[in-house]
């Protein structure tokens, strides 16, 4: 009897796939990549056609030895690694490391780990796709070149252990740009006005929102203007001008891609992106389900496609018709593609079997596994269902030359919303008072309620919104979003507080160096174009070495220029007037994982360190002591009094010496302006040269 060997990446897959195949099949795991570029050198021969020098990864020798033994026993070898460019590269490296060239080697791939999918793949073996392999090689080599060439410059300029990366540096730049926008933002005053109107015969008042005059929408920006408008409105008679009843259709959502799953799990489940990917991997590779054994519950998790197979679509059609009714079936499923580049090699993320409902597997899953599976299941079911329909009522009310509006909506047909709603879905606003209102309805003013507001700065990025931005800009791919964010968090270039992402002092320094010395590396358009070229390599339309040949000379020139310019941007050890209380030397400023600190220059003989308090030359308005630049425990910068905790002064923006001439309060820097810290005051002036940082 012939013997067959199936090689996959993970032991979890081995357990799931083994039960699908007969006794003449052996299933073994490579535990991920087995070969890579050496860590101790560039690993690319730039003099000889950029040939990579691969070595066996440390710790993989025993795994390869065991695989070689299994290969000798097998008549046929199947390489069943993941169905993407990374998986294709692992299969190719295995074929080289195991010397399979003379063997009957077959590449198989499947989008879900189910018996039918695995057995179908065995009937359709193929050769290793060298276009995908070369796309992965090009990506790996480009990333190595950037990291290997630029990281030592960061070590020289800032501290050892820092890193630069082709995608991570752009992500950091995007976050820093948003932080600068927020810091430079100056709030602007605006007012809203609501009218409580009495309807004849009704106890409850109707709440109408001020719109403007008969010509256009009005924006009211001051107390004086609001008082004038209110005085004029108070004299007028209110009457219904127009009632419009209509219908609004809300389309079903698309099934999940990697990025939309990461975004929704972050918003709905409060999962960090790394956690979402870890749990999705478990659901894909297989979970022990009571009465069914090990089952792969979802399709492959790294995808930017919204395509659904005909079989899965038909299965969903049958399930929805049976459980919800024919009227809940989509007449045409939404099939939109978005983003700068879509790799449509896979399906969307969906349950491997829609009949395996969340309730059926709940007792077999951990709480987090269940919550993520339920989210995926509901989203997929919703994507195959009919649109929701809202009944809408919009009323226009006149008060002389001024206009107010009232709007309401209610769900007439819930459609897909019977299964799935997201945080972004609008809430129905059912105003029963609008049911009988028409142009003849008598209205009288009971009360005008004005409110002062101030515009808000752009929101800080969250992991979810950052992934959305990276995808929209075409930066990175489904497999890179999570490791990119994980890396810049681990390097402490950024920190997270209550989901929001903040740049640390270390992140600001690294970003500034990258912008000055390597502008193309942190340019989003350059990076997106490079991603597009790598996709073209995977499609076989661009030679992978041509991409590297075109990239490397410019990188070399930039590195050489940065090395020559090193002294201009290097952060030297700054000697302070703080005396080391151990040995008496003047302490110096150093960079650590959390930013600046004071260290004794007598290291290693003297290891004394102290927190670094950077004075900004401004006295505290509360107690007269110095204001210093501080950091929260997680690394966010703020300004506080050196006399803390006795004095509780604190500001996120940099204070200046001058007091506000309007209210006497303290003022802060906002971009090119100096503004009063009290929004109610609203005083703004141009920044003077001496106050510039």
Can you describe what each PLM-predicted range is?
Residues 16-20, 66, 89-97, 117-121, ...:
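Alpha-helical scaffold elements adjacent to nucleotide-binding pockets in ATP/GTP-utilizing enzyme cores
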Residues 139-149, 167, 197-199, 248-260, ...:
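Core structural elements
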Residues 216-254, 441:
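Metal- or metallocofactor-binding catalytic centers and their adjacent structured scaffolds
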Residues 116-195, 246:
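C-terminal or mid-to-C-terminal helical accessory/interaction module adjacent to the motor/catalytic core
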Residues 240-243, 251-265, 292-301, 457-469:
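Short acidic, hydrophobic short linear motifs in intrinsically disordered regions
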Residues 2-5, 16, 25, 97, ...:
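Basic, low-complexity terminal or inter-domain segments flanking catalytic cores
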Residues 1-140, 211-212, 220-223, 227:
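Intrinsically disordered, low-complexity regulatory segments
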Residues 82-83, 159-163, 245-254, 266-272, ...:
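Conserved short loop/turn motifs at secondary-structure junctions
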